[in-house]
Amino acid sequence: MVVNFKVFKKCSPNNMITLYMNRRDFVDSVTQVEPIDGIIVLDDEYVRQNRKIFVQLVCNFRYGREDDEMIGLRFQKELTLVSQQVCPPQKQDIQLTKMQERLLKKLGSNAYPFVMQMPPSSPASVVLQQKASDESQPCGVQYFVKIFTGDSDCDRSHRRSTINLGIRKVQYAPTKQGIQPCTVVRKDFLLSPGELELEVTLDKQLYHHGEKISVNICVRNNSNKVVKKIKAMVQQGVDVVLFQNGQFRNTIAFMETSEGCPLNPGSSLQKVMYLVPTLVANCDRAGIAVEGDIKRKDTALASTTLIASQDARDAFGIIVSYAVKVKLFLGALGGELCAELPFILMHPKPSRKAQLEAEGSIEA
C-alpha cells in the first residue's frame, strides 16, 4: 500500500536552504497549541562550511496604518517567540512525527528536523480588512517561520539566505453546545403605568460560519407607548488589546421590519428573524476582522476568540467577539429599547483527511 502525504515547500532566494512543512494551520485548544514541526534541507556547500542555521517563530503585530508612520515611529511590533539552532544540531531530544521520519529518509543526510512550541497565551491570527485600493500591510497578527544563517540567532539575516513562511494559529469550535442564550429587558416610562418588555432568545449558543442564526423575539407592550419598528443585527466586536480605547464594533448583518407594527398599548408580538453573517456581504468594508491571511482565497470572518480566563489576555493581539442586538423603535419621543445576546461563531474542526485534501500536493 502506497501512503501519500502532503507538504509545503519553500526555498531561500539563493537556493541554499529549503523548508518543508506538512501544514500551515496550528490548532489552539485554549490550554495548549499544536507543535510546529518541519524539515530543513541544506546545500552541500553550507554543510561543508559548517554554517549555523537558525529557525525562529516570529509574531508580527501591526496596530496602525503604514501611511501614518513617521520617521522613528512605527505602528508595528515584531516579536521572536521561539528561537532554535538547527544546524549544527544541538543536544536535544526531538520526538519526530511520521512526516519528519519519512522526509528524513527521502531527503538524505543534509536534512535536519525541528520542533517549536508556540506559547498558549499568544494571540490568534486575525487581521483587519482593508479597502481594495489599499496595498499597505494590514493591521493585525501574523505568524512566520523564519529560517536564516548567521553566527548567532541575534544576527541580522540576509534576504538571499532567509526563508519566511506564513503560518496561522487557529481555534476550532468546541464539540459541545453551551447554554441557550436568552435575555429579558424592560423599560418603564414617565407618566406610564406599565412597562415595555422585550425577550430575545437564540436557538443555540454556537454557530458555524455561514450558518443561519434564528432570533426569537417576544414583545409585550404594557406601557402607553407604540412600537413602530423592530431591527435585529449581528455585531462583531474587535478589541485591540494594546490600547485602552481600542474597542469598536461593526454591524455585519442586519434586518429590520415593520410587520406587526405599530404595536399598540396592551398588545404583544412574537416574531422570528433570521440573520447570516458572512464576509461576502462585507467584502468592501474596512475594519472588519478576518482570519489571518496566508495568501488563501477562502478567507472568512474571524472566529470568536476563546481564552482560558481574562487574566490570560496578552499585552498584544486582537480579541474578536460576536453578539446579536435587537432594537425596538418607539418614535422620536419614545426612544429605543435594546437587548443584546453574545454568541460564538467558529469553524468546525475538520477531519485529518479533509485537511490533506484541501492542502493539495507540494506548494512552493
UniProtKB/Swiss-Prot annotation:
Cellular localization per UniProt: Cell projection, Rhabdomere
Maturation and modification: Phosphorylated, but does not undergo light-induced phosphorylation.
Superkingdom per UniProt: Eukaryota
Distribution of this protein across tissues and organs: Expressed specifically and abundantly in photoreceptor cells in retina and ocelli.
Principal subcellular localisation of the protein: other
Gene3D superfamilies: 2.60.40.640, 2.60.40.840
Name this protein carries in UniProt: Phosrestin-2
Taxonomic source organism: Drosophila melanogaster
Originating gene: Arr1
